Amino acid sequence: MFWYPPQRLRTQSNAAAIATLTPGTAVTTGATSSTKGSPTQIIAATDFDVWGVTLVFSDYGAGGVASDACFDLLIGTNDDVLVANILCGYSPLTTNLGSQRYWFPLFIPAGVKVSGRAAGVRTSTAMQVQAFLEGGTISPPWRVGSRCTTYGITTVPDGTTVVAGNASEGAWTEITASTTDAHFYLVPSFQLTNETGVQGRSLAVDYGVGGSGSEIQLGSAVYAHTNQEQLSTLGDLGGEDVAVAAGSRLVMRASSTGVSEDYNGAIHGVT
């Protein structure tokens, strides 16, 4: 009889063992709004081969203050970029019971450092970042990618302007005219734009593919923000299993429970 070592799914994170108002790791934005701060270690070394990463952002939004921001997920001793420019501005305070959560089906080998860096309109200001890793000795139960391409960033820390419709779908907005790679998974990121006096709203954000007038919706996400300029995702924002060919046009649109307003968005394609 052969003996097979047990296979199991494992998790690892930088979450605090004891309740705290500053969960995870403080990652500080750069000295100018378009400059990333220094890389900050989030996890010293992965305990196992990682198949999926959840990132949770909080504590960067502030009432009456513009808080556009973006974040790079870095790996290895050289701080190589695994995911660039995840839009994460206006993330709510921990005491407001909200956060922004994104999931990426990406591979990180065992024994590798995980870090992050950020840029934001609120310069030299910390945001809290939690990373939850999934993997282990099992074969991955989902398709896993090795790299991620970000589309739609205009000038850091902002993505492409998306105008939300008032209780109706806004027009499709082009995020990129042509993808550089084929992608099997897309993740949207989305934030307010230079807001200092917004009202509370719920938002439905759609993303899709196709030429002008022939767009096909591939997925959707739900956000909500308060009148204190704090924006949350409602649940984990993974993306959608898709088959997007290289050279595809990616688009985004949004609808709001209030008046039409400007937001900005990006789409992250996993390969």
Which residues does each predicted region cover?
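Beta-strand-centric surfaces of beta-sandwich/beta-rich domains
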Residues: 1-271
